[in-house]
Swiss-Prot record:
It comes from Leishmania tarentolae. Belongs to the universal ribosomal protein uS12 family. The gene is RPS12. It comes from the Eukaryota. Keywords: Kinetoplast, Mitochondrion, Ribonucleoprotein, Ribosomal protein. Its main location: mitochondrion. This is Small ribosomal subunit protein uS12m. GO terms for cellular component: kinetoplast; ribonucleoprotein complex; ribosome. It is found in: Mitochondrion matrix, Kinetoplast.
């Protein structure tokens, strides 16, 4: 999850820089704020989709009640492997 957190921070920083430096420079223009809000909402939506996919796969494949260690990249779950077939 650290990788997703760092990825999210990098994407938000990149969007912030793009919005500040590449949007119209008119003083009365609200385009900068609108574009930043749209990009920020898109990023939150992406995180929500990834969260739903991870929860779905976790519910489908694993029961976190005991069994053995499953080593994921940097994270260890103590769980029992279970496949709904």
């Amino acid at each position: 999850m650290r990788v997703l957190f760092l990825y999210g921070l990098c994407v938000r920083f990149l969007y912030f820089c793009l919005v500040l430096y590449f949007s119209p420079r008119l003083p009365s223009s609200g385009n900068r704020r609108c574009l930043y809000a749209i990009c920020y909402m898109f990023n939150i939506l992406w995180f929500f989709c990834v969260f739903c996919c991870v929860c779905f796969l976790n519910h489908l494949l694993f029961i976190v009640e005991g069994g053995g260690f499953i080593d994921l990249p940097g994270v260890k779950y103590f769980s029992r492997f279970f496949l709904n077939a």
